[in-house]
A protein has these predicted regions:
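ABC ATP-binding cassette signature C-motif
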Residues: 1-187
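Single conserved hydrophobic/aromatic residue that forms the stacking wall/gate
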Residues: 188-199
Length: 199
């Protein structure tokens, strides 16, 4: 039987005397698609933030199974307002981009006759394996496809001038490219947003 990707057992969340969630028990298998519905103010967003690791339970247990990743699209998604649309989306590949940059830099360093060629070759080989494993040689193409599919604003537009819906699409694009094992969408009430999430 497959292992659960996420489990919560008798979880309680309270702020002082105000109880937000009480005695919540749930388990999800990988690949499950589950909706949390209810009136406003009933703790749906709090539940998702706990699952994303943004908030902690007051009592009980809530845990993501080790080896899995989680990502959340919040109602007001945090973006870097000092960056453009493309710069925010590229952050999904931050680690891989750094490895590609280092790989290219090693090529330059090899031109130095005094370099430690064996050490550079070993590092280059390790980086190539890691970049290959992440399918990281074609990042610009992936970015273009994802940004087109989600109909993002112009790539050079600063995110601080975007509407709320545009900001959510930028954040969703970044999140989908990060490809977390557990994807949480807070208030994906618009059919278009849901269709974007499954593109």
């Amino acid at each position: 039987m497959a292992e659960f990707i996420y489990q919560m057992y008798q979880a309680r969340k309270a702020h002082g005397d105000k109880v937000i969630l009480d005695d919540v028990t749930l388990s999800f298998y990988p690949g499950a698609k589950i909706g949390v519905v209810g009136p406003n103010g009933m703790g749906k967003s709090t539940l998702l933030k706990i699952m994303a690791g943004i908030e902690e339970v007051s009592n009980g247990d809530a845990r993501l199974t080790p080896g899995y990743t989680v990502g959340i699209l919040q109602q007001e998604p945090p973006l870097d307002d000092d960056k453009t649309v493309i710069e925010n989306v590229r952050m999904a590949f931050g680690d891989t981009i750094a490895k590609v940059d280092r790989f290219n830099k090693i090529g330059e360093e090899m031109c130095d006759p005094d370099c430690d060629m064996d050490a550079l070759m070993a590092e280059m080989g390790r980086l190539q394996d890691e970049i290959d494993a992440a399918d990281g040689w074609d990042i610009d193409s992936k970015l273009g496809q994802a940004m087109d599919a989600l109909q993002l604003p112009d790539s050079d537009m600063p995110v601080n001038v975007l509407s709320g819906g545009e900001r959510r699409r930028v954040a969703l694009c970044k999140l989908l490219l990060e490809a977390p094992d557990l994807l949480l969408l807070d208030e994906p009430t618009r059919p278009r947003l849901i269709s974007y999430a499954v593109f």
